[in-house]
C-alpha cells in the first residue's frame, strides 16, 4: 500500500496544533490526538509497515516515549522484534549509553547491550523529527552494537528545524508521513 494524498491529509487533519505550547511562539503538533482516533492511528501504522514490508527489516527501534506507540505496532506488523531506547536507569539488563546535546545541556539514551545483533537491519521509528538529536544518538547506539540502520521513520517532520539534513549527514534515510511548516 502506497500512501495516497487523501490518506496523508486525513492523518494531518487528525494531528492537533496547540499554539504557544510549551512556550510562547511554539506551535506544538500533538500526535496524541491522532492516537485518539483508531482509524487514523491504524492507518499511520499500516502506511509505515507497508513501506518497509519488503525491506528486510529485522528489528524496529523506538525511542522513549512516543516512539514506542508507533514503533511497537510497526514491528508487530512486520513480524520482527521491537527494541526500546530509553532514558537512563529504565532498562533492567546491561545497557549501552549515548549522550547528546540539547539546546541547554545534555541528555542520555540507553539500549540493552544484547538487543541488536551484528548486521541486524534496523528501522528506527519515532513520532516526530525536529532537530534530529534523539535519532542521531539512537543511531550511534545501534551502530555501536553492529546493527545497520536502514531508515528513520516518523509520523511528523518539522523541516524548519533541520533534523532531516542532520540525519542525512550521518547517512540516515528519513521518511515522514506528514510535515508541518514552522516549529
Swiss-Prot record:
GO cellular component: cytoplasm
Stored SUPFAM superfamilies: PRTase-like
Functional pathway: Purine metabolism; AMP biosynthesis via salvage pathway; AMP from adenine: step 1/1
Reactions listed under catalytic activity: AMP + diphosphate = 5-phospho-alpha-D-ribose 1-diphosphate + adenine
Gene Ontology MF terms: adenine binding; adenine phosphoribosyltransferase activity; AMP binding
One GO-annotated biological process of the protein: adenine salvage
Keyword hit for Plastid: no
Compartment(s) of residence: Cytoplasm
Protein name listed in UniProt: Adenine phosphoribosyltransferase
Family label: Belongs to the purine/pyrimidine phosphoribosyltransferase family.
Keywords, alphabetical: Cytoplasm, Glycosyltransferase, Purine salvage, Transferase
Pfam families per record: Pribosyltran
EC number, as in UniProt: 2.4.2.7
Described function: Catalyzes a salvage reaction resulting in the formation of AMP, that is energically less costly than de novo synthesis.
InterPro entries assigned: Ade_phspho_trans, PRibTrfase_dom, PRTase-like, UPRTase/APRTase
NCBIfam families per UniProt: apt, PRK02304.1-1, PRK02304.1-3, PRK02304.1-5
